[in-house]
């Protein structure tokens, strides 16, 4: 799973199901693909979204700011700063500073995520706030590790389940990951289709998959309902590849 796919999975796992979730998923995909480069418009859109908690908006704002290239002098947004202040608790700020010092020594996404998972959500949010306010700098990869650790903690508390250190067992995250991977596979099928005889068939399968993912995000479904979605898509893709005589290992 690529880094950006993983970030998208974790961030979407804390967004409530509904039409807005499908819309946010599309914005994240566009931002990660470099298609949306107007950070100011994106932040204004995010600020006015209903339903989302201030912390979720803060995390999304942080992710957009990390990803979208912007002018150096661009003003930081108050709604993100307020969400990432650790509820104004000085203990959270103290822990955030300690965590920040540890993150400075990390160079990988997974290393940063593992270090961050031992801190409370308040401390993690405060640490994001430090980085967002330019009071500290870490690599984008490390910052994404911090984001995913925060989302995992929020998803865990939402599901009232205990975190496993080695692997993510949280069904909300697994469910979202299946849908993100299904979307990614659908995109691959569309790219492969080209002008071949089977192009129409491939486009149809990809289109159905996109609609299914969008419907699942909009209506909200039980985490187990997406279990077969990715497998069906991968089977379709492999059957299509076989007929085309194409091998694309990364989608297997």
UniProtKB/Swiss-Prot annotation:
Q: Which UniProt keywords apply?
A: Host nucleus, Membrane, RNA-binding, Viral matrix protein, Virion
Q: Name one GO cellular component term.
A: host cell nucleus
Query: Topology with regard to the membrane?
Result: Peripheral membrane protein
An individual GO BP term: viral budding from plasma membrane
Pfam families noted in UniProt: Flu_M1 (PF00598), Flu_M1_C (PF08289)
Give the chief site where it resides: virion
The region called RNP-binding is annotated at 165-252
Subcellular location as annotated: Virion membrane; Host nucleus
Task: Extract one GO molecular function annotation from the record.
Answer: RNA binding
Motif Nuclear localization signal, chain ranges: 101-105
Q: Where is this region: Membrane-binding?
A: 1-164
Q: Any further remarks?
A: Most abundant protein in virion. When expressed alone can form virus-like particles in transfected cells.
Q: What does this protein do?
A: Plays critical roles in virus replication, from virus entry and uncoating to assembly and budding of the virus particle. M1 binding to ribonucleocapsids (RNPs) in nucleus seems to inhibit viral transcription. Interaction of viral NEP with M1-RNP is thought to promote nuclear export of the complex, which is targeted to the virion assembly site at the apical plasma membrane in polarized epithelial cells. Interactions with NA and HA may bring M1, a non-raft-associated protein, into lipid rafts. Forms a continuous shell on the inner side of the lipid bilayer in virion, where it binds the RNP.
Question: How would you summarize the oligomeric state and partners of this protein?
Answer: Homodimer and homomultimer. Interacts with NEP. Binds ribonucleocapsid by both interacting with genomic RNA and NP protein. May interact with HA and NA. Cannot bind NP without genomic RNA.
Q: Which family does it belong to?
A: Belongs to the influenza viruses Matrix protein M1 family.
In Swiss-Prot or TrEMBL terms, this protein is called Matrix protein 1
